[in-house]
């Protein structure tokens, strides 16, 4: 039995759950929070080892256990949105709880992050280098990761500052969770499993994203069923909800089930 995660719910309306990415916490959703809370009952979740849940470390710290921890606090009939690593967790939660996830919103995420044969993704050397650097200098490594996330965006410096400011109020992530999170990004491949998901799934990708290449759009349209839709933000990198908040919210509102 997993320790219950702390969550925060604000607003009223249909249930909408947000899962953040690697190295940050639920504070990262600040730019879109007020708007969402006007239309939905929004639940903010810090993943195990991050933010307010930085003392909770499931053993082993793997995708299945992360998804189970989130599934335990998932309100019924939820729209589940995940960014980056959080999107990978969201996909696994939907596999565990298909009747409880009304819709998946997948933001700058992928069923497989690492580059492979005929698959665009992150070079494995980059993820391994981050793991090694974490031990030497935690805060500098997270800063470097944030810089890669913003790379390509016209407002890269502002984006990085916004992310840093939004996550500073919460406790720092546990180094073991950060290391295990990189391991998940390096090794997990959910391509076969997500093809079986039946709920509506909306992907939101940045054309300039160096972590989740926009080629993913071709895979979604070619290999996945008609319950999947994709929006590409032409000038965004890995954090479209920060760099292009207005466009992001318009698309999110248009494509989210009520």
Curated annotation (Swiss-Prot):
Active site, UniProt feature: 84 (nucleophile), 209, 238
Record's subunit section: Monomer.
Domain of life, source organism: Bacteria
Residue sites binding substrate per the record: 22, 84-85, 145-149, 238
GO biological process: biotin biosynthetic process
Protein name, per record: Pimeloyl-[acyl-carrier protein] methyl ester esterase
GO molecular function, one term: pimelyl-[acyl-carrier protein] methyl ester esterase activity
InterPro entries found in the cross-reference section: AB_hydrolase_1, AB_hydrolase_fold, AB_hydrolase_sf, BioH
Pfam families associated with the record: Abhydrolase_1 (PF00561)
Source species taxonomy: Bacteria, Pseudomonadati, Pseudomonadota, Gammaproteobacteria, Alteromonadales
E.C. number(s) listed in UniProt: 3.1.1.85
Physiological role: The physiological role of BioH is to remove the methyl group introduced by BioC when the pimeloyl moiety is complete. It allows to synthesize pimeloyl-ACP via the fatty acid synthetic pathway through the hydrolysis of the ester bonds of pimeloyl-ACP esters.
């Amino acid at each position: 039995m997993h320790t219950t995660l702390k969550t925060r719910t604000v607003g009223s309306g249909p249930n909408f759950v947000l899962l953040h990415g690697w190295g940050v916490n639920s504070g990262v959703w600040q730019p879109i929070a007020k708007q969402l809370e006007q239309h939905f009952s929004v639940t903010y979740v810090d993943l195990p080892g991050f933010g307010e849940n930085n003392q909770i470390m499931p053993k082993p710290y793997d995708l299945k256990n992360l998804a189970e921890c989130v599934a335990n606090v998932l309100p019924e009939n939820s729209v589940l949105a995940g960014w980056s690593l959080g999107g990978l967790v969201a996909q696994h939660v939907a596999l565990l709880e298909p009747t409880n996830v009304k819709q998946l919103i997948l933001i700058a995420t992928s069923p497989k992050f690492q580059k492979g044969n005929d698959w665009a993704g992150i070079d494995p050397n980059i993820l391994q280098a981050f793991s090694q650097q974490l031990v030497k200098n935690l805060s500098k490594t997270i800063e470097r990761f944030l810089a890669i996330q913003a790379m390509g965006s016209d407002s890269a410096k502002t984006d990085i500052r916004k992310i840093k400011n939004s996550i500073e109020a919460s406790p720092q992530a546990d180094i073991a969770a950060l290391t295990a999170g990189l391991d998940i990004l390096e090794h997990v491949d959910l391509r076969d499993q997500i093809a079986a998901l039946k709920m509506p799934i909306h992907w939101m990708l940045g054309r300039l994203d160096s972590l989740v290449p926009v080629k993913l759009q071709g895979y979604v349209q070619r290999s996945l069923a008609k319950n999947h839709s994709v929006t590409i933000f032409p000038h965004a990198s890995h954090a479209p909800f920060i760099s292009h908040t207005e466009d992001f919210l318009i698309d999110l509102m248009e494509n989210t089930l009520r």
